[in-house]
Swiss-Prot record:
GO cellular component: cytosol
Gene Ontology molecular-function annotations: rRNA (guanine-N7-)-methyltransferase activity
Localization: Cytoplasm
Top EC class of this enzyme: transferase
Superkingdom field: Bacteria
Protein's job: Specifically methylates the N7 position of guanine in position 527 of 16S rRNA.
Coiled coil: none
Enzyme nomenclature, EC number: 2.1.1.170
Keyword terms, alphabetized: Cytoplasm, Methyltransferase, rRNA processing, S-adenosyl-L-methionine, Transferase
Protein name: Ribosomal RNA small subunit methyltransferase G
Residues reported in the UniProt entry to bind S-adenosyl-L-methionine: 63, 68, 112-113, 125
Amino acid sequence: MMEVPREIIEKLEIFQKLVKKWNKSINLVSDNTIHNFWQRHILDSLQLMQYIDNKEIHLVDIGSGAGFPGIVLSIAGVAKVSLIEADLRKCIFLEKASKISNNNIQIINQRIEKVEIDCSILTCRAFSKLNTIFNCIKNISVQEKFLLLKGKNYLTEIVEAKEMWLFDYLIHQSITCEEGKILEVSNLTKII
């Protein structure tokens, strides 16, 4: 189990309450995950911290939605987080949620394909297949790696992506779900 300081747990509990409150008016998370919120959403996001060696980085979270994993990682100590979300209603929520963190959070209300930004690490959760992710981020420069929370079809996604892209990857077991995996991707290059 992960050791999480009390101050961070308190902030994550405030974030949890905010998500539940806003979820009544805009669909941030599935209603059937509310009963298991801490494990399904908070811990699922928080587990990425074990693959972030240096917290003094710029992390970009695409398709941020309810702020998983971006807001959680900021609360846990990542110095600068940019959240990219096309839905204005979700961006308004993310703006409110960003106040919980002591760190720098930037909300970008645009389609991912239009965003030009540099970062050390790129994350996403419940967004899309690998090929779609890689195609969407053509204007985003990822210096270090991708940390992608994936489900049971992760191997098929890797095989399909390898037809169009060269990349190195590690597969880590999720601590929250037997079928869940964390793909750590680096050295991404499109095959011409």
